[in-house]
From Swiss-Prot:
Function, in words: This protein is one of the different antigenic serotypes of protein M. Protein M is closely associated with virulence of the bacterium and can render the organism resistant to phagocytosis.
Transmembrane segments annotated in the record for this chain: none
Species the sequence originates in: Streptococcus pyogenes
InterPro entries for the chain: LPXTG_anchor, M_anchor, M_repeat, SMCR, SMDRR, YSIRK_signal_dom
Annotated region (5.3 X 35 AA tandem repeats, A-type), positions in chain: 118-301
Keywords from the UniProt entry: Cell wall, Coiled coil, Peptidoglycan-anchor, Phagocytosis, Repeat, Secreted, Signal, Virulence
Region called Disordered, residue ranges: 297-401, 456-511
NCBIfam families in the cross-refs: LPXTG_anchor, YSIRK_signal
Propeptide residue interval(s): 509-539
Name the UniProt record assigns to this protein: M protein, serotype 24
Biased composition (Polar residues): 303-312
Encoding gene (name): emm24
């Protein structure tokens, strides 16, 4: 009866030992899962907080820069508007100055043409006045003298004609002398023509013509002397031959022509003598007009100088306004370029700000998502914590059961010694005991199969519970990370006493199973390999 109880108790111990090993392995896995979950959630929370702070700081910086650029843009717009208004005012002043300058130029051109007309009229009046003033009493006396000389020449001409009428028998020896006289006659005719021209121009005598008159008087004296010589020669030429009669006729024809020209000259002299008191009044009127024209000319010249000064001043103002307009246009162009650059920068900053806001929204969404995942992870962690506490409680119970089993094992060893002493059993008792042991072994195998099924169900349930937080994106918990070596310390510590339990059963001689069964070792090895592989992937 004692043997049966002992075998039954040992079989129960063996079953409890396998269950405890599986529970310890599951405890190790749960502890690693909890630690890894805490680490992942803490790292994710810190990274999310840092990213949100950086995004918020960058968004604030972009907002400040955007406000600064808006202020600069408003200042540039105000300055640009002021410059445009100033430019419009200068343009209007420039157009007014141009219009005024155009009117002044037109007035100057009109006055210049009027001055030219007055100067031409003045020149004509001066010429007429000079010609009219040169006929003085001395000139009248000189004209009378010329008339007297003309009368003397006419008398002398009559004497010569009489001499020519009597000179019908010129000799051949005097032909050369006649030719000489003809040449001198031609020279006299030429000189007479010059005198006629001088008489024709007697209306415009000036101071310079007085010298010419003196020259003519000297030539006239020379001609008178030459005339005397010719008269003497004619007195000696009384024996012209008959062959020279044709020549004489020609000379007579020329004489008639000279007489006709002399009559014309006399008429011209008579016209030159008709300067009366009416002409003197006309001369005074012309002098008064000349003085008025000179005064008007001086006034016009003064106005022209004033207009020229005004025109030059307007020209300088116009040049200054043009230069100022160019400078303003350059500044306006520069401001427009700066405005374009600032606008481009503002748009770029606006795009960056929009991008940062969009990134901030995405990060906030991710943060919200991570918070939800964190909540789920926290719930899973709490659930795992509860499971871990339960597994630790089970571990304590297992350790307590292990202590009880060790004490029972000591009792069994004691019984084993007693059984060794009672080896002298009969074959019948051995057969009965063998049958009982086989029956108990069969029952034990069936019970182990049931426990294996329950253990498989328990593993499937734990796997489904551990996969529930992993279904969410971003929650990557590694089971058993960093905890496998710690969990494995207790089995190493219990190794020594377990070696002592590897003894044979007293009745059948079978070797007793250790505390860590093959299933428990397989679970622990799988967990360790998974933890190492996951750690390599993270590194």
């Amino acid at each position: 009866m004692t043997k049966n109880n002992t075998n039954r108790h040992y079989s129960l111990r063996k079953l409890k030992t396998g269950t405890a090993s599986v529970a310890v392995a599951l405890t190790v896995l749960g502890a690693g899962l909890v630690v890894n979950t805490n680490e992942v959630s803490a790292v994710a929370t810190r990274s999310q907080t840092d990213t949100l702070e950086k995004v918020q700081e960058r968004a604030d910086k972009f907002e400040i820069e955007n406000n600064t650029l808006k202020l600069k843009n408003s200042d540039l717009s105000f300055n640009n508007k002021a410059l445009k208004d100033h430019n419009d005012e200068l343009t209007e002043e420039l157009s007014n100055a141009k219009e005024k300058l155009r009117k002044n130029d037109k007035s100057l051109s009109e006055k210049a043409s009027k001055i030219q007309e007055l100067e031409a009229r003045k020149a004509d009046l001066e010429k007429a006045l000079e010609g009219a003033m040169n006929f003085s009493t001395a000139d009248s006396a000189k004209i009378k003298t010329l008339e007297a000389e003309k009368a003397a020449l006419a008398a002398r001409k009559a004497d010569l004609e009489k001499a020519l009428e009597g000179a019908m028998n010129f000799s051949t020896a005097d032909s050369a002398k006649i030719k000489t006289l003809e040449a001198e006659k031609a020279a006299l005719e030429a000189r007479q023509a010059e005198l006629e021209k001088a008489l024709e121009g007697a209306m415009n005598f000036s101071t310079a013509d007085s010298a010419k008159i003196k020259t003519l008087e000297a030539e006239k004296a020379a001609l008178a002397a030459r005339k005397a010589d010719l008269e003497k020669a004619l007195e000696g030429a009384m024996n012209f031959s008959t062959a020279d009669s044709a020549k004489i006729k020609t000379l007579e024809a020329e004489k008639a022509a000279l007489e006709a020209r002399q009559a014309e000259l006399e008429k011209a002299l008579e016209g030159a003598m008709n300067f009366s008191t009416a002409d003197s009044a006309k001369i005074k009127t012309l002098e008064a007009e000349k003085a008025a024209l000179e005064a008007e000319k001086a006034d016009l010249e003064h106005q022209s100088q004033v207009l020229n000064a005004n025109r030059q001043s307007l020209r300088r103002d116009l040049d200054a306004s043009r230069e100022a307009k160019k400078q303003l246009e350059a500044e306006h162009q520069k401001l427009e370029e700066q405005n374009k650059i600032s606008e481009a920068s503002r748009q770029s900053l606006r795009r960056d700000l929009d991008a940062s806001r969009e990134a901030k929204k995405q990060l906030e969404a991710e943060h919200q998502k991570l918070e939800e995942q964190n909540k789920i992870s926290e719930a899973s962690r709490q659930s795992l914590r509860r499971d871990l506490d339960a597994s630790r409680e089970a571990k304590k119970q297992v350790e307590k059961a292990l202590e009880e089993a060790n004490s029972k094992l000591a009792a069994l060893e004691k019984l084993n010694k007693e059984l060794e002493e009672s080896k002298k059993l009969t074959e019948k008792e051995k057969a009965e005991l063998q049958a009982k042991l086989e029956a108990e072994a069969k029952a034990l195998k069936e019970k182990l199969a049931k426990q294996a099924e329950e253990l498989a169900k328990l593993r499937a349930g734990k796997a489904s519970d551990s996969q529930t937080p992993d279904a969410k994106p971003g929650n990557k918990a590694v089971p058993g990370k960093g905890q496998a070596p710690q969990a494995g310390t207790k089995p190493n510590q219990n190794k020594a006493p377990m070696k002592e339990t590897k003894r044979q059963l007293p009745s059948t001689g079978e070797t007793a199973n250790p505390f860590f069964t093959a299933a428990a070792l397989t679970v622990m090895a799988t967990a360790g390999v998974a933890a190492v592989v996951k750690r390599k992937e993270e590194n």
